[in-house]
């Protein structure tokens, strides 16, 4: 595997200078500095590691970590969970892993981790993710290297690939929200990172969940319970863009037979804004939602220097503080086209069985 390093650029996010090694976009291998990407020094994985991507992999936002889900949702929520629970996370699964950076985050945060399962829709995506996980553990201690080496990659929809597995202490999911347009193909590039085939869940999901475009998050909880995939104290972490009320998310958990809470909350720049915001705007005009976005300047001001865990403790207060400045999807699309940077809160819900 060849790595191409061309130059080193500096970005400023939340008053931290992030140095990212730039690689030509035509190549599919990158070198990531852990601190540059996640914002803190690694505890257990290698300080620098390479990642390889399939054409079908969700592209990590290495040039703008504030737009990356592994940074704003996975790593932040893992830290919050590790700090708030006495139950060690030993068995971990990530659903829709993409490049595998969420699994790398788990390997670094959870000191008792002994088993990782990564899933995605495509075999080649999870194959690359496994390679990336091993790269991140290359210079780590023996336990970490063994966990990475023995990690399992499975392909399939939602939690179906996990059926029959030994129960997990933690299942993390960050699944798409927008129904697949008639003229789109889930096998085309990164389409499956943004869209899902709503025919797969037709008739299963409560109407209030579908109206909020949270279908797959509900399905994951339902499958976790039906397939008996959680230990007695096991948790499902659902990573959701805060474009709908937090109360709707908590009601979703209850409808699936779980008790939900918000251990972590952050914000991110809207990635792929042309297609994503337009997708939400189109569906809002058809009667779904409404869906809300915010100017990046507003999000930066309201969240300030709060950690994910601190923001999670005050999630409803933050939501109320943002209300006067919210833009529905149609307004957000217009603002984006005017050159205004648009983002949204990132809400991670922890669900335990009732």
Give each language-model segment a name:
Residues 68-183, 187:
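Conserved SAM/SAH cofactor-binding pocket of Class I
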Residues 172-219:
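Mobile active-site "lid"/loop adjacent to the S-adenosyl-L-methionine
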Residues 175, 351-354:
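C-terminal beta-strand of the catalytic ATP-binding
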Residues 179-187, 249-251, 273-276:
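Short aromatic-enriched loop/helix-cap "lid" or pocket-rim segments at secondary-structure transitions
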Residues 208-268:
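Conserved Class I SAM-dependent methyltransferase catalytic core
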Residues 274-286:
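Short, surface-exposed amphipathic charged segments that create phosphate/polyanion-binding patches used
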